[in-house]
């Protein structure tokens, strides 16, 4: 159903036999099952009393769920209340729920009685018999309510199949004789698929379709056909339509068969319209002349056309439609929706929001004012005491007004020149506000009043009302304290003059050329020196990078390869590097050096003893390279050990260990123990 009434959520109602089996089985499963006569009598009594209480609580919960989930006739919308009365019989429905409630109270009483009797049982056998009697009596009550359980289950099934009707939303209701085209109309304007047959009473229940008009959601209700007979003679099918017309605030579409193929004449259809017309009160009503594809309104005899014209004179629109050719269908739908929208908007405008009962009563009270009979003034007599109270009340209201409204206060209080105001008026100023008439002599004047009197001459003084031992200290300068220090102790009173002296000295130094550079960088010699210095710096950077790369490579491959590496120093490299640095080397000297370098050594090498070669330099472990010193590494090791405590406590191998151990060993949870004498109980 809607958000208010969702009858589909009602739990299934078991029959008496099923409920008995369920509760007894649950009692046997959820309570202990082994007791021995060797136990103390208190333990035996508690064993059987627990079973009685458990069954009582289980039945209490089941019956309470049934009672609370079914809707109460007095609490739901009148439309659903009357519809349930028509479909299920209000008295039968209430009696069934009442029997459930009575059974619940009787079961509670039986349980209390037998738990009390259990205290006087002196053996296991007597306790068992009391438990058996208690369970038997409680289950016997369920068997006696067999018909009520079956009836409530049928009601639940039918309620869950009812259409989703929202009594508060925008609604169109189709009504009329059977077989006049109501179901065909709802199939055309909505996506509903109502069965359409050429015989009467094809529709035996309410059907709902939904449409969108002007970006709003509308529901269209197809009602069963209504026959022209007294209300007490109508059957259940017809009363569903009457209930919808009586309780739903909707636009009514009375469908008529102008071709008279529904075995009803125009006069009979209009007579039905007049008989159910009281149900259309305060609702927009439209008449749809259906089946105009067979017979138009203009083809009607004069006496029948006159009857329709009489309805139009009464303000009831009549629109010709044909559900076969779609003629006039959308026009009738739009006209009905527009009239209902206009009525809802007008009702919202005229409605007044009433918050409490007093406003509700005062809204209906008419106050009469007597007309004057002559020109004589008959003023009311006000006692002096009452006048003083009124003045005091005005003063309080004025003070509250000043606190809330601020500048608007001057426009809402009486204007009268005070002492200062009179002086200003004498000097040609404007009249100011005085509240002297609204207060007594002992009341202190507010700053707001003084401000209104003095206007632009007012200066706010918050220190004049300070209550100090020495009144002369009111206007002393309060020291500014920051973190326990007086800021005045850190301020040099002559700092401004000292700053001016420093600025003056700087100006004199600038004028004397103290900050001018002695190096003239415009001559050619200076430019050459700067260029050479730049080249030297770049060369140093390259050598530094080259050395770092070679050192890193040597550290990886070890000293064995380093010892057999080819000598990279040569005369050409030396000459190029010295030339780049601007050193002039004689060509002859370079040739002599080259010759000496290339001269091979003659003779055998002298065999001399040598010490053990250095081992290859092994790189440090990666987990140690990340730390700058040993202290940092020790701190990280401590944190790692602390983080692993939880894993060790849970016996996990590491952070990725997600193994779930067997929490239910089969030998402990199988049906029987291995010796064949005892079961799992």
Swiss-Prot record:
Tissue expression notes: Ubiquitously expressed.
Keyword Mitochondrion annotated: no
Pfam families: NOG1 (PF06858), NOG1_N (PF17835), NOGCT (PF08155)
Gene disruption: observed consequences: RNAi-mediated knockdown results in an extended lifespan, reduced brood size, slower growth rate and increased fat storage.
InterPro entries: G_OBG, GTP-bd, NOG1, NOG1_N, NOG1_Rossman_fold_dom, NOG_C, P-loop_NTPase, Small_GTP-bd
GO cellular component, one term: nucleus
Source organism superkingdom: Eukaryota
Principal location: nucleus
Domain OBG-type G: 170-341
Gene Ontology biological-process annotations: determination of adult lifespan; negative regulation of lipid storage; regulation of reproductive process; ribosomal large subunit biogenesis
Annotated compartments: Nucleus, Nucleolus
Keywords of the record: GTP-binding, Nucleotide-binding, Nucleus, Ribosome biogenesis
Binding site for GTP: 176-183, 222-226, 290-293
Any GO molecular function: GTP binding
Family: Belongs to the TRAFAC class OBG-HflX-like GTPase superfamily. OBG GTPase family. NOG subfamily.
Role summary: Involved in the biogenesis of the 60S ribosomal subunit. Has a role in regulating longevity, growth and brood size. May regulate fat storage via the insulin/IGF pathway.
Protein's name in the database: Nucleolar GTP-binding protein 1
Gene responsible for this protein: nog-1
């Amino acid at each position: 159903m809607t958000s208010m009434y969702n009858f589909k959520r009602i739990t299934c109602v078991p029959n008496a036999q099923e409920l008995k089996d369920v509760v007894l089985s649950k009692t046997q499963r959820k309570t202990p099952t082994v007791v021995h006569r060797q136990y103390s009598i208190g333990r035996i009594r508690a064993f059987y009393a627990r079973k009685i209480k458990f069954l009582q609580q289980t039945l209490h919960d089941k019956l309470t769920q049934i009672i609370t989930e079914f809707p109460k006739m007095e609490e739901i919308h009148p439309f659903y209340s009357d519809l349930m009365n028509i479909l299920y019989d209000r008295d039968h429905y209430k009696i069934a729920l009442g029997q459930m409630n009575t059974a619940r109270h009787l079961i509670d009483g039986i349980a209390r009685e037998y738990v009390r009797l259990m205290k006087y049982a002196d053996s296991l056998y007597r306790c068992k018999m009391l438990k058996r009697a208690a369970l038997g009596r409680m289950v016997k009550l369920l068997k006696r309510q067999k018909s009520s359980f079956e009836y409530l289950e049928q009601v639940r099934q039918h309620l869950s199949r009812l259409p989703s009707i929202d009594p508060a939303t925008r609604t169109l209701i189709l009504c009329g004789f059977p077989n006049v085209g109501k179901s065909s109309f709802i199939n055309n304007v909505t996506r509903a698929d109502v069965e359409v047959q050429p015989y009467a009473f094809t529709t035996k229940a309410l059907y709902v379709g939904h449409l969108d008009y002007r970006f709003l959601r509308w529901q269209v209700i197809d009602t069963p056909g209504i026959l022209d007979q007294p209300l007490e003679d109508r059957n259940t099918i017809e009363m569903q339509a009457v209930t919808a017309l009586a309780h739903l605030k909707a636009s009514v579409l009375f469908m008529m068969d102008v071709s008279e193929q529904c075995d009803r004449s125009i006069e009979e259809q209009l007579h039905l319209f007049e008989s159910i017309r009281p149900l259309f009160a305060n609702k927009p009503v439209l008449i749809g002349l259906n089946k105009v594809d067979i017979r138009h309104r203009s083809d009607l005899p004069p006496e029948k056309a006159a009857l329709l014209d009489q309805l139009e004179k009464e303000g009831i629109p009549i629109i010709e439609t044909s559900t076969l050719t779609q003629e006039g269908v959308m026009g009738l739908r739009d006209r009905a929706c527009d009239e209902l929208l206009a009525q809802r908007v007008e009702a919202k405008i005229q409605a007044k929001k009433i918050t409490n009962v007093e406003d509700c009563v005062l809204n209906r009270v008419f106050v009469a004012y007597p007309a004057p009979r002559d020109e004589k003034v008959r003023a009311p007599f006000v006692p002096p005491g009452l006048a003083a109270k009124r003045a005091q009340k005005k003063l309080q209201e004025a003070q509250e007004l000043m606190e809330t409204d601020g500048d608007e206060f001057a426009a809402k209080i009486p204007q009268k020149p005070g002492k200062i105001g009179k002086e200003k008026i004498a000097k040609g100023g404007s009249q100011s506000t005085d509240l002297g008439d609204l207060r007594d002599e002992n009341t202190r004047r507010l700053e707001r009043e003084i401000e209104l009197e003095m206007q632009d001459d007012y200066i706010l003084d918050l220190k004049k009302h300070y209550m100090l031992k020495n009144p002369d200290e009111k206007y002393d300068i309060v020291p500014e304290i920051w973190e326990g220090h007086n800021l005045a102790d850190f301020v040099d009173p002559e700092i401004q003059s000292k700053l001016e002296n420093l600025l003056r000295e700087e100006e004199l130094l600038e004028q004397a050329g103290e900050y001018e550079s002695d190096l003239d960088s415009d001559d050619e010699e200076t430019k050459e020196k700067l260029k050479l210095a730049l080249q030297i710096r770049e060369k140093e950077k390259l050598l530094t990078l080259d050395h770092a790369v070679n050192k890193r490579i040597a550290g990886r491959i070890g000293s064995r390869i380093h010892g057999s590496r080819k000598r990279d120093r040569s005369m050409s490299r030396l000459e190029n590097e010295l030339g780049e640095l601007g050193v002039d080397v004689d060509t002859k000297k370079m040739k002599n050096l080259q010759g000496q370098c290339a001269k091979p050594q003659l003779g055998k090498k002298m065999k001399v003893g040598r010490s053990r070669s250095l081992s290859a330099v092994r790189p440090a472990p990666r987990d140690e390279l990340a730390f700058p010193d040993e202290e940092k590494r020790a701190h990280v090791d401590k944190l790692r050990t602390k983080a692993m405590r939880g894993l060790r406590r849970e016996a996990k191998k590491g952070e990725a260990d997600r193994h779930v151990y067997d929490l239910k060993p089969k030998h402990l949870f199988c049906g029987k123990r291995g010796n064949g004498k005892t079961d799992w109980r």
